Amino acid sequence: MKGPTLALFLLLVLLAVVEVRSRQTVKLCGLDYVRTVIYICASSRWRRHLEGHFHSQQAETRNYLQLLDRHEPSKKTLEHSLPKTDLSGQELVRDPQAPKEGLWELKKHSVVSRRDLQALCCREGCSMKELSTLC
């Protein structure tokens, strides 16, 4: 009876330590910030997630190319049917009636928020969970 109780206790302590570490803030500036973000985003968990997303995008592209062979749509039709993605591979949702300047504003906002997080990490510190939002 003592063995399972001790094992359960040690497991709970381990989980508590992991939770505290994820909440800890670390001040990261310059190259340390960049290295940490790359380390977090390049972990095997993120790579598996991105590989799955990449394969689904390839399948979608293949389907669009097959449609192209059959129907040969105009350039304008093709622009509206293909999914729009940003540099991170995330799909952008955009109203076809909205002006094109809105897309630039979206990208500018993304870059600004990343710069803000970098400045905040350097000044006050940030947690690993906050850094993982950049992936």
Curated annotation (Swiss-Prot):
Which tissues does it occur in?
A: Highest expression in colon with lower levels in thymus. Minimal levels in testis.
Classification via Gene3D superfamilies:
Insulin-like (1.10.100.10)
Localization terms from the record: Secreted
State the function annotated in the UniProt record: May have a role in gut contractility or in thymic development and regulation. Activates RXFP4 with high potency and appears to be the endogenous ligand for this receptor.
Please list the GO biological process terms of this entry.
positive regulation of feeding behavior
**Propiece residues:** 49-114
Alphabetized InterPro entries for the sequence: Insulin-like, Insulin-like_neuro_ligands, Insulin-like_sf, Insulin_CS
Report which gene this protein is encoded by.
Insl5
Q: Does the keyword Signal apply?
A: yes
Q: Where is the signal peptide?
A: 1-22
State the similarity comment. Answer: Belongs to the insulin family.
Protein name per the record: Insulin-like peptide INSL5
Any one GO molecular function term: hormone activity
A GO cellular component term found in this entry reads: collagen-containing extracellular matrix
Q: What does the subunit section of this Swiss-Prot or TrEMBL entry state?
A: Heterodimer of a B chain and an A chain linked by two disulfide bonds.
For this UniProt record, the keywords arranged alphabetically read as follows: Cleavage on pair of basic residues, Disulfide bond, Hormone, Secreted, Signal
**Can you list the disulfide-bonded cysteine pairs?**
29-122, 41-135, 121-126
